[in-house]
């Protein structure tokens, strides 16, 4: 692989992964295969284990048992720099603020492709500039990262992952802090890149619109997996989320659309009005 080559989409295998903390399973025997170029959404209520599972993929947390394989190689056996050339992560939390400009943060995405102590070359600068433009933060290039709003920081971190040119992406609530336009832009970008992606999302309608398949997590386990129209059913939403909802086909897109019935409890007793 050349220094500036873009990694091809890889196959990601989560093989019987469990994570135990103080004897309690946060992730419980999860297996999931994401084919090259496929976008799989992780959905489920808070505390279901989505973020914990993703941390095992981008190697922030070692599984108690099981393996995570990228193109057949255990990610824990890959040199860090090699893994970073092939896998990029966008996290929902910002681990402290960087004492760097926006440009410098995005340029960090080029680090896996450089020799030690090497500076940016023309290709690096072009890639960083393109990523800044793609995420609509080019006008912030010289601004201190730590002075940005939450949404601006999120877009910068997505731009950093884009500059990494990895073939596989892990995104934990990438639309967190983003307004509606930038939520759509971010997920459209993931689709357009053609990368292999696992995306944790809370918005079920966004998940149905942009993901090839959904894995529904509950209490650390995957309880349903498949195409959005097969997975998102009123019965599943009642069981997993404890809400009553209608799931209909959107008349323009043909995709499943979830409408929460905020005026009903799970027994169907009228309490108020319905809301999309």
Language-model features: where?
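Conserved ABC transporter NBD signature motif
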Residues: 66-74, 83
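ABC ATPase nucleotide-binding domains
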Residues: 234, 238-276
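Conserved ABC ATPase "signature" region
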Residues: 107, 122-140
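Helix-to-loop junction immediately C-terminal to a conserved catalytic motif
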Residues: 58
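The feature captures the beta-strand-to-loop junction immediately N-terminal to the Walker
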Residues: 43-45
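Catalytic Walker B motif of ABC-type/P-loop ATPase nucleotide-binding domains
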Residues: 169-173, 178
């Amino acid at each position: 692989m050349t220094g500036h080559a873009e990694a091809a989409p890889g196959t990601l295998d989560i093989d019987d992964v469990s994570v135990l903390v103080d004897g309690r399973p946060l992730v419980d025997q999860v297996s999931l295969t994401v084919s090259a170029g496929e976008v799989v959404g992780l959905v489920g209520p808070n505390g279901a284990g989505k973020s914990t599972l993703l941390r095992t993929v981008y190697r922030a947390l070692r599984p108690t048992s099981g393996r995570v394989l990228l193109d057949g190689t255990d990610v824990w056996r890959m040199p860090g720099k090699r893994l970073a050339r092939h896998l990029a992560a966008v996290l929902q939390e910002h681990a402290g603020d960087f004492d760097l400009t926006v440009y410098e943060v995005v340029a960090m995405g080029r680090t896996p492709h450089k020799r030690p102590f090497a500076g940016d070359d023309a290709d690096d600068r072009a890639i960083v500039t393109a990523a800044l433009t793609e995420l609509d933060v080019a006008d912030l290039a010289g601004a201190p990262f730590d002075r940005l709003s939450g949404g601006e920081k999120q877009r910068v971190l997505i731009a950093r992952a884009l500059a990494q040119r990895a073939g596989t992406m892990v995104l934990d609530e990438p639309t967190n802090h983003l307004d509606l336009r930038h939520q759509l832009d971010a997920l459209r970008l993931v689709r357009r890149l053609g990368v292999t992606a696992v995306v944790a999302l809370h918005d079920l309608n966004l998940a149905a619109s942009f993901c090839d398949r959904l894995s529904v997590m509950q209490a650390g386990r995957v309880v349903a997996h498949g195409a959005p129209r097969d997975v998102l059913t009123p019965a599943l939403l009642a069981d997993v989320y404890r809400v009553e909802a209608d799931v209909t086909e959107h008349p323009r897109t043909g995709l499943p659309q979830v409408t929460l019935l905020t005026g009903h409890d799970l027994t169907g007793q009228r309490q108020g009005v319905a809301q999309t």
